[in-house]
Amino acid sequence: MKIEVIKKEENLLEFYLEGEDHTFANLLVETLRENPHVKFTAYTIEHPITMARKPRFRVVTDGEITPEEALEEAAKKIFERAKEVLEAWEKAVKS
C-alpha cells in the first residue's frame, strides 16, 4: 500500500491509495462517513484497467479536525473492528 497525495488544503485532502481496490476503498469511505467532522468523502477508480488498484480519494472536513486526523481515526477504527472479528472467530473455533 502506498499513498500519493494529489492535493492538500486546510480541510481538503485528495490522494491515491496504490495497491488497493473497491474492497478496502469502500471500507475506508464508510468508516470516514461515521465521523461527524467529515463533510464529504468518496473515491473513484479513474480507469477500470490501468487504475484498477489505485483508487482516488477525496476527504473534506468541517475544520474541527484535519482530513489527515479523520483518516487516522478511521484507520484505528478499521483495525479495532478487524481485531474484534478475529477474536470472535477464535472464540467460535474453540467452541
From Swiss-Prot:
Source organism phylogeny: Archaea, Methanobacteriati, Methanobacteriota, Thermococci, Thermococcales
Cellular component terms per the entry's GO annotation: cytoplasm; DNA-directed RNA polymerase complex
Subunit and partners: Part of the RNA polymerase complex.
Family: Belongs to the archaeal Rpo11/eukaryotic RPB11/RPC19 RNA polymerase subunit family.
Record's catalysed reaction(s): RNA(n) + a ribonucleoside 5'-triphosphate = RNA(n+1) + diphosphate
Subcellular localization: Cytoplasm
Natural source organism: Pyrococcus furiosus (strain ATCC 43587 / DSM 3638 / JCM 8422 / Vc1)
Keywords: Cytoplasm, DNA-directed RNA polymerase, Nucleotidyltransferase, Transcription, Transferase
Protein known as: DNA-directed RNA polymerase subunit Rpo11
UniProt function note: DNA-dependent RNA polymerase (RNAP) catalyzes the transcription of DNA into RNA using the four ribonucleoside triphosphates as substrates.
Gene Ontology terms, MF aspect: DNA binding; DNA-directed RNA polymerase activity; protein dimerization activity
E.C. number: 2.7.7.6
